[in-house]
Amino acid sequence: MSGGKKKSSFQITSVTTDYEGPGSPGASDPPAPPAPAGPPPRLPNGEPNPDPGGRGTPRNGSPPPGAPASRFRVVKLPQGLGEPYRRGRWTCVDVYERDLEPPSFGRLLEGIRGASGGTGGRSLDSRLELASLGISTPIPQPGLSQGPTSWLRPPPTSPGPQARSFTGGLGQLAGPGKAKVETPPLSASPPQQRPPGPGTGDSAQTLPSLRVEVESGGLAAGTPPLSRRRDGAVRLRMELVAPEETGKVPPIDSRPNSPALYFDASLVHKSPDPFGAAAAQSLSLARSMLAISGHLDSDDDSGSGSLVGIDNKIEQAMDLVKSHLMFAVREEVEVLKEQIRDLAERNAALEQENGLLRALASPEQLAQLPSSGLPRLGPSAPNGPSI
């Protein structure tokens, strides 16, 4: 049959039971061996023959017990490697798996994560960028032979909540001393094979993508991958619920969208402020400005663009803090200038009185003054007539 030239096929399909091809599980020939002329009457799970587009192919179809491994074949794809194409409302990219060392692939992923500043919400786009470069994961999928796979990306018109940039994805801080998050490594399985569970509900889609670790003093690179979000969701839910039960959540942490770089309010209140509440107010204004503009980068597709936006916001926040501190310093300087002016006027009046007293006093009266007062009165004597 003409199954070797399927259109927009992105999954390994199974052949009927009467297939007698001599191929092996990892056969490199793209065209399929000849099969019976008529349409196959059945599939391993009893469903009808799939259409040429591959939409009727059962995803969960498994061969009967005792079936040989040659029942699987490699489907040749008409698209080139890394070329995106539309499949319904999804944009798909097909990737061939190659022999790539797992340590080097892990180092590459760590390098990408480090270069993007610990972004975890863009894991899906990072995989797609790797797919466009022709790099695929070395870990085979369970139940499928080594062949072409595809990773799906939602269309740009309706971005899913899973692919959030780390600038606006921070939900709540769990309070000082309790924010410990362990980021699981990137998974090699596609997003559609995420195991369902109670921990993958709405709370898993609104996980914070960047957390501040108070105990360890570091930044945790945020959202777990889609296929292993179950454990991460349970951890984060426990950490977000425990402070609310004990009533120790700071009031500043109840915002739905907080900036990625977050200053703890307790540190601001505990630190000595020489200028009163001006510095704390400036920090709160900077945090609110970042919180308002943090969600603007949630649909940004480029990690570098989001990093540039974050740098610009940090610079704006620092300028705002600097301006508020300058206002406080100017007020203090004005107060000190007034005090210096008053002291100078009082000093001038005292010097004038001293000069008059010295001019009117007799030598006998000056001789009766204590010896300790002479050094103080000596320098001011020549200034008496001038005043």
UniProtKB/Swiss-Prot annotation:
Enumerate the residue ranges of region (Disordered). 1-85, 135-232, 368-387
* UniProt subcellular location: Nucleus; Cytoplasm; Cell projection, Dendrite; Synapse
**Record-linked InterPro entries:** TSC22/Bun, TSC22/BUN_CS, TSC22D4
Statement: the UniProt record of this protein carries the keyword Zinc-finger: no
Q: Where is this region: Leucine-zipper?
A: 336-357
Q: Which residues carry this modification: Phosphoserine?
A: S62, S165, S187, S189, S254, S258, S271, S362
Q: Where is the signal peptide?
A: none
Enumerate the Gene Ontology biological process terms: glucose homeostasis; negative regulation of transcription by RNA polymerase II; neuron cellular homeostasis; neuron projection extension; response to osmotic stress
Q: Which UniProt keywords apply?
A: Cell projection, Cytoplasm, Nucleus, Phosphoprotein, Repressor, Synapse, Transcription, Transcription regulation
Q: Please state which protein family the record places this protein in.
A: Belongs to the TSC-22/Dip/Bun family.
Q: How does it assemble?
A: Forms a homodimer or heterodimer. Forms a heterodimer with TSC22D1 isoforms 1 and 2. Interacts with NRBP1.
User: What is the designated name of this protein?
Assistant: TSC22 domain family protein 4
Gene name, Swiss-Prot/TrEMBL:
Tsc22d4
